[in-house]
């Protein structure tokens, strides 16, 4: 799949993905169709069918592979906005849906702009891992069950708002970190140093060694605070903490190999930014 994106003319991926993301987000116009006489489900089905037909008409592989993913995420974002403004107990879930779709789309867009050489369909992170998928499904199931049997729990607006602020903070920090790192940022931990790889210690990297992980850490926990999911909130916190503990150690082994004393000095001066995580231990 990574090879598909490579055959798209360089520089066009960002424009293509943005155009089709906005196309999918035009589902926001669906209420106008229902006012015109179409029933909600009928209008939605016709809209989805129309989107698919348009994408098939306009694009061929590999551009279609990018377009369908970006359009899907735009569609999910639009549905999230509609749900957010609905008069139901699911409006906070709409916030979550918007946050989730924006996270995945922005990962691709920023990579396309910032480091196109590393860009692939995997940059959407839609197939991140089985564990990631299970975690997401678990949070949806918990929200649904608690919304049915304990609906008042899902209407603690101040708590959901606090979770939304955590999500916004985490998302912004991660994207700033990606832009600051530039071509040095990669979704995959590198085992070999490229000729252009440099150690970034400025900007947000002067505050913490792993700002992109810090952002993702608080974003992940914030989604569950937003949903008022007590069970997944605790499980997410423990799971992502352990994941980033192992991930920082794995990455720092490579960074020490790449940059030697330069990274060791940086490591002494600047914390990881993640709570109770110090990174790989270096023997004296």
From Swiss-Prot:
Residues 34-41, 88-92, 150-154, 229 are lumenal. Pfam families: ICMT (PF04140). It catalyses: [protein]-C-terminal S-[(2E,6E)-farnesyl]-L-cysteine + S-adenosyl-L-methionine = [protein]-C-terminal S-[(2E,6E)-farnesyl]-L-cysteine methyl ester + S-adenosyl-L-homocysteine. Residues 1-16, 60-69, 113-131, 175-212, 245-284 are cytoplasmic. It comes from Rattus norvegicus. Gene3D superfamilies: 1.20.120.1630. It is found in: Endoplasmic reticulum membrane. GO terms for cellular component: cytoplasmic side of rough endoplasmic reticulum membrane; endoplasmic reticulum; large ribosomal subunit. Catalyzes the post-translational methylation of isoprenylated C-terminal cysteine residues. GO terms for biological process: bone mineralization; CAAX-box protein maturation; determination of adult lifespan; fibroblast proliferation; in utero embryonic development; liver development; methylation; multicellular organism growth. GO terms for molecular function: cAMP response element binding protein binding; protein C-terminal S-isoprenylcysteine carboxyl O-methyltransferase activity. InterPro entries: ICMT_MeTrfase (IPR007269), PPMT_MeTrfase (IPR025770). This is Protein-S-isoprenylcysteine O-methyltransferase. Belongs to the class VI-like SAM-binding methyltransferase superfamily. Isoprenylcysteine carboxyl methyltransferase family. Its main location: endoplasmic reticulum. Substrate binds at residue 247. The gene is Icmt. It is a multi-pass membrane protein. S-adenosyl-L-methionine binds at residues 190, 197-200, 205, 210-213, 251. Its EC number is 2.1.1.100.
């Amino acid at each position: 799949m990574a090879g598909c994106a490579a055959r798209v003319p360089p520089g066009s991926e960002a424009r293509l993905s943005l155009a089709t993301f906005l196309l999918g987000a035009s589902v926001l116009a669906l209420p106008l169709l229902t006012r015109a006489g179409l029933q909600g489900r009928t209008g939605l089905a016709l809209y989805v069918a129309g989107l698919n037909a348009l994408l098939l008409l306009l694009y061929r592989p590999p551009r279609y592979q990018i377009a369908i993913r970006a359009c899907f995420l735009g569609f999910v974002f639009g549905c999230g906005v509609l749900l957010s403004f609905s008069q139901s107990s699911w409006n906070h879930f709409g916030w979550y849906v918007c946050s989730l779709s924006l996270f995945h789309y922005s990962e691709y867009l920023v990579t396309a702009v910032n480091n196109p050489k590393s860009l692939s369909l995997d940059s959407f992170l839609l197939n991140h891992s089985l564990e990631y998928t299970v975690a997401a499904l678990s949070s949806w199931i918990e929200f649904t069950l608690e919304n049915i049997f304990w609906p008042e729990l899902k209407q603690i607006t101040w708590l959901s708002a606090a979770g939304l602020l955590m999500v916004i903070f985490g998302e912004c920090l991660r994207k700033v970190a990606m832009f600051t790192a530039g071509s040095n940022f990669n979704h995959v931990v590198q085992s070999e140093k490229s000729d252009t790889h440099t150690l970034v210690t400025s900007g947000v990297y002067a505050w913490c060694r792993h700002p992109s992980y810090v952002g993702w850490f608080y974003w992940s926990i914030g989604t569950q605070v937003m949903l008022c999911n007590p069970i997944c909130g605790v499980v997410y916190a423990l799971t992502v903490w352990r994941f980033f503990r192992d991930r920082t150690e794995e990455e720092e082994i490579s960074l020490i190999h790449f940059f030697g004393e330069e990274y060791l000095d940086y490591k002494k001066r600047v914390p990881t930014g993640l709570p109770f995580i110090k990174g790989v231990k270096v023997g004296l």
